[in-house]
Amino acid sequence: MRIYFTRGINDEVAKNTQFAKEIVESIKRYCNHDWGDLCAEDKEMNEKALKHGGRLLAAYKLSVAKVYIITDDTKANEWVTTILFASEY
């Protein structure tokens, strides 16, 4: 799995160590299928995507702002994950 930060996330991580720690914790939660602040329907869609393929989405309210973690399966069967501010979506 490749993980990418948007410019906004990258800039905030570079200047804010607390936020950087929150991002690491969010990634750990995501890897453990803790989808954060999603409704039950979106969480169920993630569970189906794990079994049958598709996009995964998580949302976490951090100290600076809400962030999304989104994973897509590419045509090369490689998981690509992007972390972005909700405002960047």
Predicted regions and their residues:
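Compact soluble domain cores
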Residues: M1-A58
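Short, compact, well-ordered microdomains
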Residues: K51-Y89
